[in-house]
Amino acid sequence: MAVAALEQEILILRKRRQLYSLIGLLLVVAVLVSGFSKSNEMNSGGFLQGLSKFFDYPGEIVAEAWQAGPAFFGLILTFVPAMLETLNIAAVATLLGGAMAVVLAMASTRNVDSWGPLIPVVRRIMDITRAFPELIIALFLIFVLGSSPVPAMIAVAVHTAGALGKLFSEVNENIDRKPIEGLSACGASWLQRIRYAVMPQVAPNYLSYFLLRLEINVRASAILGFVGAGGIGQELRRTIGWGQGAGDETAAIFVLLFCTIMMIDQVSSYLRGKLVGSGRAH
């Protein structure tokens, strides 16, 4: 009897859970439909009208690239300098942001004996740097510094410092404290404990997150070109703005971006796998 009653109770709970899930799903669908209808009304029905032409522009780009013939590959080469500029922005920003992230992570983690009153202050600083997207920071800096790669580099570096700082601090919280306590008992300073007890433990994970962030920053640097921050994004904005007649150049930029990001992703994934594997081995 007790088993039958328990099975009946489980069945009731399961049906109740399914009912709640269905109600939640219906509410989400209702909100999405309502929001879409309102947005479409504000846009004078432009979304549905434009949906029928969704593939028109990509079709024009492909057609113009096909008409270019072998010269299309020459077009790809003409945009390599702009792509290198984007890679430089991403690399420098990742290096600067990564260096700042290490400092922020070490100053915001109790597990590495950081100064107590400083920890919440540094954590709030990291929250602030993560709160603003790179695009918003870049727009502000372009207004102050003018259109150049420098605002993009600073914007990506600031956001990287906050994002990596958070990840690095979580890595710090999971380290073994025995080496730190041993060096502390020997009279080692805080910097010596960080260098000889903390960094050997966290370095593989730090580098893995660093490489992952480099992938993200390459994409971010390309997007920032749309707001005048230089690089391949600025060239893409120019070719798209010209419309018909520049479709082959637009296609060349897309191909170059795709190949570059794919190559970076593959190399980064391979290196991160090696780093994480070596970290576990130790």
Q: Language model features by range: what are they?
A:
Residues S147-V198, P204-R213, Q266:
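Membrane-cytosol interface at the C-terminal ends of specific transmembrane alpha-helices
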